[in-house]
Amino acid sequence: MKKAALHNLGCKVNAYETEAMQHLLEEAGYEIVPFTQKADVYVINTCSVTNMADRKSRQMLHKAKKNNPDSIVVAAGCYVQTSEKEVLNDLSVDIVIGNDRKHDLVRLLEEYSLDSVNDTVDDINDGKHDFEELFIDQTKEHTRAFIKVQDGCNQFCSYCIIPYARGRVRSRRFENVIAEVERLAANGFKEVVLTGIHLSSYGVDFEEATGLLELIQAVNAVKGIERIRLGSLEPKIVTEHFASELSKLDKICPHFHLSLQSGCDATLKRMNRKYTIKEYERGCELLRKYFVHPAITTDVIVGFPGETEEEFEQTKAYLEHIHFYEMHIFKYSKRKGTRAAVMPDQIDEQIKAVRSEKLIALGHDMSKEFRKFYIGKNEEVLFEEKAVIGDKEYFVGYTKEYVKVAKKTDENLENQIVSGRISGMLTDEILLFE
């Protein structure tokens, strides 16, 4: 039996695609082994979101060939799409697969075995591509499954290469999403996370008036699924109608990641983000109107070109005002091929580091405050796995708001939803469950 190893770099969409490619290989009779072991085939699903991601992708391709010089090394994904010539000239790489050919993995391996011909990468931006159907019915996790429902992005933020790597918006057919959710439910999964490159755009490429809300409502009707989470959302999707209709669904998790990037309108304009801080705040207000204490999380970029001290302080004050559950703080890094990379007034790395530290500290304080709200309250927790915290063993899981909880027990609670009382804080990041 031939052996194959896969390695994923990047986002949750990439992770889904890697699991789908593993499924294809298993169906074709391959034995899946850890990436560190010797294999006949190595598949690296690459990332290109930053220059560092490009470098890591190259490193993993070279590592694969070093593991077994006689192996077939497959480079797939975003780095392949943005750096085609570089990848085709890389002697470590045998097969290249862009972001619309992953379903062809097994066929391309068979063809390569016959004539050793490398493949070319299609232009993902020519507007001629449909959603690439990939399927999973199992994941590495045993309780939560990520489902890719959308690909591509039409936004073209000035710092981002992803529209060039992923192409225009393409949505997965409604019936195919539901069929996959039903398969996962039949295999015991209780929670699904709907994800995409630009999830809020789901359905804009359909002739019929079907959008993300209608998809969520349909998933909510699937028997066996008890929780639905959403990937990153654009602020403008949160209208009164959207928030009101979501709140009527019994399975929706009140955990919303609204991408912000900056709390300053001038910075947002340079980023080519298509909303104002006032519009963003309105989205948060609506979520808090229709959900009790929802978890609102976000991303923030510090040190974007031209960000003055005054603009940074405005962002910091805005973050405190919105009061997020969690914030992912990124120091701006140049990405070749984007408009921001050639903008004037690039910020010194030391200044970026100081600003980042300030926001990370702020985020830590806000997260701790958010978690404290639950002390003394009864919550439902989906337990996932055992973990050693301090020197004691606990079962850990998450509330609907994605707050991590630990319970001291000898029972096997894996994939069980249990009701109980939050008695206190075990650590700054984990609540204690009775």
Question: Where are the regions that the model predicts?
Answer:
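Proteins enriched for Cys/Gly/acidic motifs involved in redox and nucleic-acid/cofactor modification
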Residues: 1-202, 217, 241, 246, ...
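Generic beta-strand/beta-sheet core signal
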Residues: 7, 76, 195-197, 231-233, ...
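Short, solvent-exposed loop/turn segments at secondary-structure boundaries
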Residues: 53-55, 168-175, 203-209, 270-273, ...
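Conserved strand-turn element in the central/C-terminal portion of the radical SAM core barrel
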Residues: 156, 160-167, 227-236, 262-272, ...
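Radical SAM/AdoMet-radical enzyme domain recognition
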Residues: 186, 213-214, 221-227, 239-298
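Short, electropositive alpha-helical surface patch
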Residues: 207-220, 240-254, 307-325, 349-354, ...
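Hydrophobic, well-ordered secondary-structure elements that form the walls
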Residues: 258, 299, 319, 327, ...
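Terminal RNA-binding accessory module
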Residues: 342-434
